[in-house]
Every structure is written in C-alpha cells, then in structure tokens.
C-alpha cells in the first residue's frame, strides 16, 4: 500500500509532500488514520528553542546578517518599507507562507529599481546581477531565488538553502543548528557530528511527528485494531482523504457492506 501525505497536515510548519510504501503479509491491507492537525506557527516554533550557551548546536548556520548582507532584503526594508527593522517587517506580514525577498520585490517593485539603488549605494556588481534578473523576468525566464526566507506561519520544504537562509523572527540573524533541527522535530538532546559539514543531514530525515504517525498506525495493525481492506494494492491519500483500490474492491461502499 501507499500512504500519501504532507508534513503540514501532521502539525509541522513546513509544506513537504511525503509518500510511504508498505508491504503487508496476506491479502488484506490496513486502513490508516487521516491527519489534519493545526500546524505549529513557524515563528513560535523558532522562539521556543532554548538558547543555551553550553549547547554545541547553539551556533549559527550562517554568520551573515540578513538586513545587511542580503541586498534584496535590505532594499525591501529601506526602500519599499521606508526604513523599518527586520523585527518590524516580520510583525507586518500577513498570516501564511514565509516570504522570499525576491518574490516580494517582484510583487511590490522590480529589479531595475533594485539595480539603481544598488549602483547608487556603490555596489555595481550586485546591480548588474539585478538587471540580469530583470531581463530574465521580462523574457519569461525563471530565477534561482536563494535569498533569505522570512518566517511567517509556515515555509516550504525545509531542504536545500533554507537551513542557512531562514531568519529568526525577532533577531536580525539566521538560524542556529538547534533551531534548524527543530523544523524536523529532532530531539533537543541530539547533536549532529560536524554540523557545518553535515548540515544537510537535518533535511534528509522524515520529521519526527510524521514518522511517529506512521509508526502508530503500524502498531495498530500489529495489535489488530485497524480496519482492513481486502485488496492487492491500495493508495490512501491523506491530502484528499480518498482511497484508490484495485481489483478486489470496486468501491469503499462495497467494502463497508
């Protein structure tokens, strides 16, 4: 059987599709529970992580300062928003997905204005890059938007550049290793060996709550408390709350008779 879901439905603050495959002995397949837990607010989750000086994971994933070293984010704070702070910008965001500064600029301004501002502030190299972005957008192309990620309710899949580019909601900095690990609900007494080198190991895990939900259903099956469907192959979709069956049962109604 296949169980399709996404992390957000298991109470996490990231949107990430997940598919689990199971092989069952016999000619019946257990029906798993459906999940739709309210997701933990991304900002509150980051704030909840203790700042312990003795914790070896209490080290920044990046020493850059978002409001100063990310040119696009600096443009937003100073030019689009009139000189507000990082904390004020986070507080101004509508509930929803985290904000990528480049997407924000594409919605509220444009790259030619960013280029003019960068050139005026003595950064011609970054200005040229902004102009190339403007040309790509005008030509119908796409961009690699690997800039900062400003937290709100939730974010996209916590992979790739995000562990080094998600900002703290209050402090003008990026995450610590411990805060990054919280996205996957890794135990707070768990440490990564050589975290700078192995940062991506965080992303390669299934979040603890999602994995625990699958394990709970397996436990129910072993205890004999699951509803069973007589079929060879079953797709159970937690996102749509639907079942797709094959040759043994033509419908769920038939199974329930």
Where are these regions (language model features)?
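C-terminal target-recognition/interaction regions appended to catalytic cores
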Residues: 86-257
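Class I S-adenosyl-L-methionine
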Residues: 1-138
């Amino acid at each position: 059987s296949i169980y399709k879901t996404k992390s957000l439905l298991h109470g996490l603050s990231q949107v990430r599709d997940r598919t689990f495959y199971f092989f069952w002995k016999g000619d019946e397949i257990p029906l798993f529970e459906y999940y739709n837990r309210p997701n933990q607010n991304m900002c509150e989750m980051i704030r909840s992580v203790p700042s312990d000086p003795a914790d070896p994971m209490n080290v920044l994933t990046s020493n850059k300062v978002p409001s100063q070293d990310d040119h696009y984010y600096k443009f937003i704070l100073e030019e689009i928003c009139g000189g507000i702070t990082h904390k004020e910008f986070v507080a101004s965001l509508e509930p929803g997905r985290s904000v990528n500064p480049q997407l924000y600029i594409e919605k509220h301004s444009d790259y030619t204005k960013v280029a003019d501002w960068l050139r005026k502030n003595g950064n011609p190299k970054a200005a040229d890059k902004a102009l190339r972005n403007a040309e790509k957008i005008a030509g119908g192309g796409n961009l690699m938007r690997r800039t900062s990620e400003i937290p709100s309710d939730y974010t996209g899949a916590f992979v790739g550049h995000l562990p080094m580019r998600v900002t703290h909601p209050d402090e003008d900095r990026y995450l610590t290793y411990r805060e990054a690990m919280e996205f996957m609900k890794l135990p707070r007494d768990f440490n990564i060996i050589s975290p700078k080198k192995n940062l991506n190991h965080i992303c390669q895990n299934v979040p603890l709550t999602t994995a625990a939900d699958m394990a709970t259903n397996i436990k129910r099956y072993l205890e004999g408390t699951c509803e069973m469907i007589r079929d060879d192959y079953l797709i159970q979709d937690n996102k749509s709350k639907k079942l797709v069956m094959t040759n043994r049962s033509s419908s769920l109604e038939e199974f329930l008779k």
